[in-house]
């Protein structure tokens, strides 16, 4: 892929990503696939599967950069992505109940918890309608509980 050979298009964000991530072992093809999950939001009918894959790639990249692996990290990324899209009223094409059930009771390693804390909040929001505003005591407690236990 061109990104792997330092042929980065003149897009500042892409150049910054390539400069930071390719030296850390992230492949250019992964960066290119990452954008697909985000560009689907620009269409009239966003593709739920593509949105979810964008989250899966984001979390797989995050886990790689944190130096940890977990079989459920991509599922966690899908849940996070779908809930963030719904929280911002960008799309309601998918309600992440499958992902929520798959992650129920799963415990993430300490090294991944700064990343998976976002999933704990997404799971909390998925169980409530409408989701609470950011910064409430209940959401803060969710972050603390996840940091201590690693459970979703």
Functional labels for PLM-detected ranges:
Residues 1-39, 47-152:
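Catalytic cores of Mg2+-dependent Asp-rich isoprenoid enzymes
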